[in-house]
Amino acid sequence: MLNNTILHAERELYLTLLAWAQQQPNAYEWLTQLPTWLNDIKDKANYAHAPAYQASVARLPTLTVDNVQLNSDILTIDAQLSDSERKQATALLKQLMPWRKGPFKIGSSQNEGEQAEPIFIDTEWHSDWKWQRVAPHLGNLKGRRVLDVGGGSGYHGWRMAGAGADTVIIIDPSCLFYHQFMAIRHFVGSADAHDIGRYRTHYIPVPLEALPDNSQLFDTVFSMGVLYHRQSPFEHLQQLKGQLVKGGELVLETLVIEGDANTVLVPHDRYAQMNNVYFLPSVAALIGWLEKAGFTEVRCVDVAVTSTDEQRKTEWMNYHSLADFLDPNDPTKTIEGYPAPMRATLIAKK
């Protein structure tokens, strides 16, 4: 069951890529693969929950939206919301749990007359905290084409649009995250549109390695929380580089450990209960990796230990979270005995 939200969003994506292709032939390969990318994520044979997720998005109530704040810590859709609409929307949005990246708020902040309390999607991650750490160090996003790799529900992609990006394309192969994005798109509507009416924020449900090599379409590429999941970090860095225009900016955020340029942790089995973590370099080692991959002007702009206030269990993500993955007797270590999660953000030029 597809509703107008998903169909219209996909049409806007197609028209955006078509406009690019008219100026840059590299975008034609994206256009030719787009139908396959979009059809695969809806295929029940590949994703058993896809029909249920589509139905949840299709049944969301249509609200009168007064304002959308894409550049606030809580991505806020200021809309008229009755009690019945609140109950309906909350139930449907909770069918898209777990919500990991956010937060989001839907409803009126005035609470006057018939208005219900806003819906607050309190996600597992305070993704706004990460954005606060990253944003001051970015080049100006105004008018730029941006690729957000591993964008989850799309929170950071919306923030990039709010910061003035001309076009943001979020990629992530998760069927759930794709439909979470579409649920938020349902309420955002055309609030992020250009003057000519084209949406600026789009989502393609594929991993980075599915994209055409060496597209060179983007002024800024973000890879946040992805590198440590890659079995070949240098291949990932080369793929990121291939999507950038010459002189473009890479924003890389990943797990790191203390140490010198020769220090890299390779977890034996799991790290913080994740079985798909392969390499945790020191900041110095990571700088060396980026330089070896051909990036220049590499700089580390932030290092932060992840706290149980930033990543935690909530009403909207009621599974295990960071507190369950740390040593109960020593929170500076994971349950496996490794250093607790610490994240660094590096910025580099192609």
Swiss-Prot record:
GO terms for biological process: tRNA wobble uridine modification. Keywords: Transferase, tRNA processing. Carboxy-S-adenosyl-L-methionine binds at residues 101, 125, 130, 150, 172-174, 208-209, 224, 228, 343. It catalyses: carboxy-S-adenosyl-L-methionine + 5-hydroxyuridine(34) in tRNA = 5-carboxymethoxyuridine(34) in tRNA + S-adenosyl-L-homocysteine + H(+). Its EC number is 2.5.1.-. Belongs to the class I-like SAM-binding methyltransferase superfamily. CmoB family. This is tRNA U34 carboxymethyltransferase. It comes from Psychrobacter arcticus (strain DSM 17307 / VKM B-2377 / 273-4). The lineage of its organism: Bacteria, Pseudomonadati, Pseudomonadota, Gammaproteobacteria, Moraxellales. The gene is cmoB.
